[in-house]
Amino acid sequence: TLFRSGNKYSDLQYTSGKWGKLNAAPYFDAETDLSKRTLPFEGSLNPYLTISDFLEDTIIRVPHTLNTENYFNGNLKFDEKELAYILPIKPLLFEYFTVEEVRGNMPDGKPMLEMNILAGNSGVKVVLRIPIQGTRNIGYIEYTRLYYNNRGADVQNNEGGMTEFKFTGFIMPLVKFNNEDDAIFNVSCIQSVTNKIEFQFFKDNERLQYKNRTCRNEDQQIMNKADNYLLEGTNFDFIRVHNNHGYAGILLPVFRQQRNIERFEFAIDLGTSNTHIEFRKGNEK
């Protein structure tokens, strides 16, 4: 990873010398193959990472309340109900860091991922702290991107855009299985019949294949549809939510560890207007 200009990172080592006060790392690199990138201001062939490798250009707003007990919200603190944001991070981040690290804190207590509402509710500030082998005083660098309401992204100037996805959903069960061979997840994405929002499932940075996907209520006369995904034989870490326009973000569930004491069976009926869930414990009838 490279640094911005200024005094904060000026004494950090960069190739054969110090980074200095005038060098400024680019916000993105058009070369998608990391092994083919050349280092800025130095020119040698060497992989490096920019803020745009870890953060999305556009943040996704959702007009629903997020259950923060079951899903990580990026340490965002605000009181507005019926509004949430999908994490604007990319799967590549999990090639280098675990889910627990992304949800956790730096040695100085600051969170690795932090989100704040801008003044006047004009947008969202996202800070991603990346650990480095730095100096005694600097153990991480900070990537910061501001996402503004009702505008497109301007990555050249590190200004993020904002869009809205109208959907809801659930994961059943919200449990990490001790034996992955026993794992079975039913995941639903409920949205307007005209929307084209899809879920992708990842473990670490590897995309998983779900067993099947079915759609309820595809009839255009019905307002909403439910896309149901069945994932078997593996745990997963996060869901990448994306649409046909290329906007994407990540849902990071907070899974509970499976307890081998009790067994539950669930039956879910996704109706046109209501969702009905029944369950039984063990061998109960």
Task: List each language-model region with its residue ranges.
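Acidic/polar, low-complexity linker and loop regions
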Residues: 77-102, 217-259
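Short glycine-rich, Thr/Ser-proximal phosphate-binding strand/loop in the N-terminal lobe
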Residues: 130-152, 283-285
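Ser/Thr- (and often Asn-) enriched beta-sheet segments in non-cytosolic proteins
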Residues: 98, 114, 125-129, 140-147, ...
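Short, small-residue-biased leader/transition segments that mark boundaries at the very start
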Residues: 1-2
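Low-complexity, highly charged intrinsically disordered N-terminal segments
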Residues: 122, 145-232
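Non-catalytic protein-protein interaction scaffold segments in large eukaryotic complex-forming proteins
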Residues: 5-126
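Gly/Thr-rich phosphate-binding beta-strand-loop-beta motif of the actin/hexokinase/Hsp70
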Residues: 256-284
